[in-house]
Each structure stands twice: as structure tokens, then as C-alpha cells.
Amino acid sequence: MATVKDLAAYVCDKLAGKVLIHRYDAYSTNSVYLKFDYGLGNSLRLSDHTGKAGLNYRFNIITTLKSLGIETSGEYPRFYYPPDMVDKAIADIMEGVTEKRGRYRDYEKALETARTRTKGERGFWEQARLVKGGEGHDVP
């Protein structure tokens, strides 16, 4: 069975060059968090356990799951994939990113606004690192 870190590396490799990817590896749990296009393309939590109450990630890959789950109690659906559906999760993430890019008249400006907003924010953005550049973006 693939580990959480193996799955995170696989997702990053498959999405390389398609979206900007920021990664945060939790220090107290076996979880990896990925945000795409400064959060405009949503986020992915990869873990071997259920998450903290109040923290909602649009996409989740949980290594102990056996089948796809969808939570619809909030404003947006949240998807829970078993590890063998990682490619489905990647396809769903890219479908959402493509939809968002079509929604914004100037996606590059929206990206810049999101980037500026995250500067100095505590939590994820304080500790995450840019691991893959997106379309037309290189990792500095």
C-alpha cells in the first residue's frame, strides 16, 4: 500500500506544470496538505486518519478508505477518495481548476491577488513550500 508521502509525491508529479502547488507536511500527524494555485484551485488533504473538526478540504485521499465518499453538508461538496482512486482525484482537481480558470476574466490577476493575500498569513501559508510551478510559472 502506498504511503501518504508517496501519494503526495505522485499527485505533485502528475500536476507538475499544470497548477502551482504548495505543500505542507504536518509534523504531528501523518498528513500532507496541498493547495493549488494559491487556493483558487482548492486543496487536497492526504492522510491515514480523519481530519480535525472545522477544517474542510474539498479533496481528500484517506489511505484507510475502501470506496469513494462525498460529503454534501456544507456549501460545497467534499470528496473522500481511497488511495487506489488517486488518478480520479487528480482528474477532479484539474476539472475544478479548468472551471475556475474559465470563470475569471483575468486568472493571472486573481492568482496574484491570492498570492498577495497569503503573504504573512499564519498556518498553512506560513509553513508551506512551493513545490511545482504551474502553466507559465517556474518554482523560484
Question: What does each model-identified segment do?
Answer:
Residues 1-40, 69-76, 80-83, 100-140:
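Negatively charged, low-complexity tracts enriched in Asp/Glu with abundant Ser/Thr
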Residues 41-95:
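Intrinsically disordered, low-complexity regulatory segments enriched in Ser/Thr/Pro
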